[in-house]
A protein has these predicted regions:
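Conserved RNA-binding domains used in RNP assembly and mRNA/RNA metabolism
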Residues: 2-92
């Protein structure tokens, strides 16, 4: 099997929040978007979006599961947290 490098990323991003309760305009003005975190492998990235997966299969054909598509416009930061080598003598 050919060796492949897989990188595990931590992505910090902003998400929409909402509420159905009654509130003063002043209190509502203090509300903020939710800060969310996704951990996984980046399986696709272009100028509009980044797609993460936190599961992959080593069978042929390789497949991925548990995908999260995040618009790049809401991503605050991406941090590389781990690199693994798939295949080869010391791989998975």
């Amino acid at each position: 099997m050919k060796s492949k490098i897989k990188k595990i990323w931590l992505c910090k991003w902003k998400d929409i929040t909402g509420s159905a309760d009654w509130s003063s305009p002043e209190r509502a003005a203090k509300e903020e978007p939710a800060i969310c975190y996704t951990v996984g492998f980046i399986v696709h990235q272009d100028k509009h979006k980044t797609i993460f997966s936190n599961e992959f299969s080593l069978v042929d054909p390789a497949e991925i599961g548990n995908r999260t598509v995040i618009p790049n416009s809401v991503i605050v930061k991406k941090t590389l947290i781990h690199t693994i080598k798939e295949g080869g003598k010391h791989g998975m």
